[in-house]
């Protein structure tokens, strides 16, 4: 069972939903990189459930403990160990379903692979709870990227039949304003159109009250990434980003830029023509999501 992602910068995760703790080991960070624990806590708070009927009813403190690799607010250059204690565990709630195969869950596949030795409590290692370790490790890296002028922002594209305003991918200035608006939000319910918030929340709560759930899409933009980052073919930007994205439980599809919409375009419509603007090369449109040949071209 391999639980490590990355090579030059690698994150190894550990833990189970109802175990004593979950966490990760982040290896490859250079020495002397500032680590803001308040920023990490803010990222964790955006992920954390609030018992408001919009996500899991399980509420955890999600306090990240930095066990190694950080001294006096800076990385030491050695592995950074992060741990989050599990406090709200009620394994007895799963006793009646211990021998049932829940649809849409990894109960059967985990049994087939681990022959019954897997920790099935709360989904064990397959639980969405483990994404807290991804957020903790990601927050350390996100802070470093932010100081390098690279911002990553995400909003809810569509959920429960309610759509948000899409990113202005062809207009870097407008996209920058959208990014600032999202970064200024203090909660984890990221929307660009405030009028979509209440209808979306109402639909989510209605499904929960009926014992059901809803699906959705997220839209992410990376701003400030210079041209020339990535590799062709097997280690392309798309390959690496998709690899990590599919590590999040329940993710079943991903597209870059116009994505599957290319099926309805002609080549002349899909091409992103290059031009000069402000002394730098940009593209007139951004159907390809700032990526050509697996390598960034400087567009979002």
Q: What residue spans do the PLM features occupy?
A:
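A structural-propensity feature for long, helix-poor, extended segments
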Residues: 50-69, 163-190, 194, 208, ...
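Glycine-rich, N-terminal phosphate-binding loop and its surrounding beta-alpha-beta segment
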Residues: 43-109
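Structural signal for hydrophobic packing residues in well-ordered secondary-structure cores
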Residues: 44-52, 84, 88-90, 112, ...
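Acidic-glycine-rich active-site phosphate/pyrophosphate-binding loop
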Residues: 1, 102-117, 214, 268-278
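Glycine-rich, mobile lid/loop segments that gate access to catalytic sites or pores
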Residues: 113-233
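Glycine-rich anion/phosphate-binding loop at the beta-strand->alpha-helix junction
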Residues: 13-20, 135, 210-300
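Acidic, glycine-rich active-site loops and adjacent beta-strand->loop/helix elements
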Residues: 17-18, 30-31, 46, 86-88, ...
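N-terminal, positively charged regions that mediate nucleic acid binding
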Residues: 1-58
């Amino acid at each position: 069972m391999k639980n490590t992602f990355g090579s030059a910068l690698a994150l190894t995760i550990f833990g189970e939903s109802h175990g004593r703790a979950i966490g990760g080991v982040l290896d490859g960070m250079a020495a002397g990189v500032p680590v803001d624990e308040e920023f990490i806590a803010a990222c964790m708070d955006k992920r954390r459930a609030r018992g408001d009927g919009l996500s899991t009813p399980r509420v955890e403190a999600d306090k990240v403990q930095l066990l190694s690799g950080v001294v006096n607010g800076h990385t030491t250059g050695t592995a950074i160990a992060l741990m989050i204690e599990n406090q709200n565990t009620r394994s007895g709630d799963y006793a009646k379903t211990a021998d049932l195969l829940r649809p849409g869950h990894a109960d059967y596949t985990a049994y087939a692979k681990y022959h019954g030795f897997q920790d099935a409590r709360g989904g064990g290692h397959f639980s969405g709870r483990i994404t807290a370790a991804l957020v903790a490790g990601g927050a350390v890296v996100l802070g470093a990227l932010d100081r390098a002028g690279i911002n990553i922002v995400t909003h809810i594209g569509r959920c429960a039949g309610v759509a948000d305003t899409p990113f202005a991918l062809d207009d870097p200035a407008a996209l920058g304003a959208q990014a600032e608006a999202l970064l200024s939000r203090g909660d984890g319910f990221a929307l660009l159109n405030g009028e979509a918030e209440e209808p979306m929340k109402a639909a989510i709560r209605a499904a929960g009250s009926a014992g059901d759930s809803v699906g959705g899409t997220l839209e992410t933009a990376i701003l400030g990434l210079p041209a020339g980052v990535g590799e062709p073919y097997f280690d392309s930007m798309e390959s690496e980003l998709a690899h990590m994205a599919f590590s999040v439980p329940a993710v079943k599809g991903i597209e870059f830029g116009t994505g599957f919409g290319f099926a309805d375009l002609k080549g002349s419509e899909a091409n992103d023509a290059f031009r000069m603007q402000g002394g730098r090369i940009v593209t007139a449109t951004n159907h390809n999501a700032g990526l050509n040949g697996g390598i960034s071209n400087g567009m979002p």
